[in-house]
Swiss-Prot record:
Keywords attached to this entry: Metal-binding, Zinc
Descriptive protein name: Protein png-1
SUPFAM superfamilies xrefs: Cysteine proteinases (SSF54001)
Single GO biological process annotation from the record: glycoprotein catabolic process
One MF term in the entry's GO annotations: peptide-N4-(N-acetyl-beta-glucosaminyl)asparagine amidase activity
InterPro entries: Papain-like_cys_pep_sf, PNGase, Transglutaminase-like
Family recorded in the similarity comment: Belongs to the transglutaminase-like superfamily. PNGase family.
UniProt binding sites for Zn(2+): 150, 153, 182, 185
Keyword Methyltransferase: no
Zinc is among the record's keywords: yes
Annotated spans, Disordered: 363-412
PANTHER family: PEPTIDE N-GLYCANASE PNGASE -RELATED, PEPTIDE-N(4)-(N-ACETYL-BETA-GLUCOSAMINYL)ASPARAGINE AMIDASE
GO CC annotation terms, alphabetical: cytosol; nucleus
Length: 412
């Protein structure tokens, strides 16, 4: 047992004692920080520990409302499993053209791999098919609409207000209508905001959320495992599962972006709090895949982290049995869940380590020292940002980083 002996020395801590100590610290954090659970510093070693799921407290109305909201959203990707919708989608996809483009791109990746002495190309035919779909979808099929042009004279329009949908528009899933006026002829232009992928597939225009809605459905039409990804800060995109790389890949059909998870905070300066991926297989908190800096993480105040973990498991248990009825498939998906959870926690640990090194170097420079971070260029220290190929493992005795983090000490 660890502790001080009579001679004033100390016994070494074995793994069991360390585990018990972490568990006690975990439980203490849960009890003492239930109301002030987000203004905490993160210990990298503790961050690598899994979150313990817990249901929303009976008096936590905000967490209960968040639970209901996420469960409601989890039904959206289930609409993509409609056989009639998928058949209609397949009729609109130029399969021969996309397949030919995919074959040509696969050959390029194979040639590149051979020139580098690698036996495995970066992407397989499956991913190249999605890449071809992405190019066709953004460039030829779906149109981004800010202010719709006047249907009478094609002149620009200005928005007046939101109005209620007509019965016909409502029947086609419009929840509201944006009303615009032509700057030239004064004619009114209605822009219904549809929610169903079926109707969006027909009108072929919309904004970022509409792009993600339809593109994710088209991936399912090609029998690609796909997720509809929701960001609380008003943005949506897609993830597809790469069998070739055994991981989920970021796809933004509105920006024609492929495997660029850090695009939002690096290129846009976008800060995010919750990023949740939904599919027929369940729900996953993938925030750490897209927030590559503690400074880009907004307060996560909707519920405790343990409650969010509970909600994710609740949604998964709600939908997965229907689409993964056999034990072999469930076991495979469970193993994927575990691997992804480890990857996401590792990504965040590496992010904190990078931030700690940069802050230490900045402090040394301010004192007149010459210390600099190992990564002088500021490049991502995690190797591939999506794979989590961490180059600098965090030691167990790593110091507490002097950066504020909104992840609680008892979980990532």
């Amino acid at each position: 047992m660890a502790g001080n002996n009579s001679g004033g020395g100390s016994y070494p801590l074995d793994d069991h004692v360390k585990s018990v100590a972490r568990d006690l610290q975990h439980r203490f954090a849960q009890m003492s920080n239930r109301d002030q659970k987000f203004d905490l510093h993160v210990i990298p070693d503790l961050l690598s520990q899994p979150v313990v799921p817990e249901p929303p407290a009976q008096d936590d109305k905000e967490a209960q409302n968040f639970e209901k909201y996420l469960i409601a959203m989890s039904h959206i990707p289930l609409n993509y499993e409609n056989p009639g919708l998928l058949d209609e989608a397949l009729q609109q996809i130029p399969l021969d053209r996309l397949s030919q483009e995919a074959e040509e791109e696969v050959e390029l990746f194979q040639a590149k791999a051979a020139s580098l002495g690698r036996s495995k190309p970066e992407w397989s035919h499956q991913e190249c098919m999605v890449r071809a779909l992405l190019r066709w979808f953004r460039r030829s099929f779906f149109t981004f609409v800010n202010n719709p042009p006047c249907s009478e004279c094609l002149s620009p329009t200005n928005k007046i207000r939101n109005v209620a949908p007509t019965p016909e528009e409502r029947a086609h899933s419009a929840t509201w209508v944006e009303l615009y006026a032509c700057v030239t002829c004064g004619a009114y232009e209605r822009f219904p905001r549809y929610t169903e992928a079926w109707q969006l597939l027909r009108v072929k225009r919309g904004r970022a959320g509409d792009f993600a809605n339809v593109f994710t459905m088209l991936c399912r039409a090609l029998d690609i495992r796909a997720r509809w990804v929701w960001c609380q800060e008003d943005y949506l995109w897609t993830e597809i599962y790469s069998e070739h790389q055994q991981r989920w890949v970021h796809v933004d059909s509105c920006e024609e972006a492929w495997d660029m998870p850090h695009m939002y905070y690096k290129n846009w300066g976008k800060k995010m709090s919750y990023v949740i991926a939904f599919s027929r297989e369940g729900a996953v908190d993938v925030t750490r895949r897209y927030v590559g800096s503690p400074d880009a993480l907004l307060p996560r105040t909707r519920c405790p982290e343990g409650v969010l973990k509970f909600i994710m498991e609740e949604i998964t248990n709600l939908h997965r049995p229907k689409y993964a009825p056999d034990g072999e498939t469930r076991l495979r998906l469970y193993r994927e869940d575990v691997a992804e959870d480890v990857q996401l926690r590792s990504l965040w640990s590496a992010t904190l380590e990078q931030s700690r090194r940069l802050k230490a170097a900045a402090a040394a420079a301010a004192r007149g020292g010459r210390s600099s971070p190992d990564n002088k260029s500021g490049a991502n220290m995690m190797g591939s940002p999506a794979t989590g190929d961490i180059k600098r493992p965090i030691p167990e005795d790593a110091p507490v980083p002097d950066v504020p983090s909104l992840w609680p000490t008892y979980g990532p």
